[in-house]
A protein has these predicted regions:
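Iron-sulfur cluster-binding electron-transfer modules in prokaryotic oxidoreductases
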Residues: 1-174
């Protein structure tokens, strides 16, 4: 709904595979190689037709924007192809705040909430991509935003830490 209000043409890639982050973090590099190459080949079929690829999730956007290029450090052709794609890859909050009128749209919506909210930065947003102010700027348009104490503290998820080292917590959470 928001993208329509911003009058953006949206294309949802139907054949995109997993970005490969879970495999990358656990050392399953044959899987990373397969997934990244298949995605690069698929993205290349339409990337010149779009201005940007916006990804709402920090780990996937960091994987595609930065880690694919790093992963292919010994495969120059694939590294170059990943680098070319990375120029159009953006985390959604960064692109929407910097390239659209979303902040004004939210501010003029007439919706102001009294709830006090805080925002925890995903590590792959703040520490890898430098994205931390953009989500706050957008949230402040409709909410009272209060920074949490020790906002740089790790949430404990750590890529696949929750699934491996803290399996009982993950299972209990569902």
């Amino acid at each position: 709904k928001i993208l329509k209000k911003l009058e953006l043409d949206v294309m949802i890639p139907k054949k995109q595979l997993c970005c490969g982050a879970p495999a990358y973090f656990t050392g399953a590099f044959d899987t990373v190689d397969y997934l990244a190459k298949k995605n690069i080949e698929y993205f290349e079929t339409w990337i010149d037709e779009v201005d940007a690829v916006i990804i709402p999730e920090a780990t996937c956007s960091a994987m595609i924007k930065q880690d694919w290029e790093h992963y292919f450090h010994n495969q120059p052709e694939w590294k170059a192809r990943a680098k070319k794609l990375s120029e159009k890859i953006f985390m959604a909050t960064k692109w929407l705040e910097n390239n659209t009128d979303l902040k004004n749209l939210l501010a003029s919506s007439g919706k102001k909430f009294d709830e006090l909210v805080t925002y925890h930065d995903p590590c792959h947003a703040k520490k890898m991509q430098g994205i931390w102010q953009e989500p706050r700027n957008l949230l402040k348009q409709n909410y009272v935003l209060k920074e949490m104490s020790d906002s740089n503290r790790c949430c404990g998820f750590g890529g696949v830490t929750m699934q491996t080292e803290k399996y009982d917590f993950a299972k209990a959470a569902g």
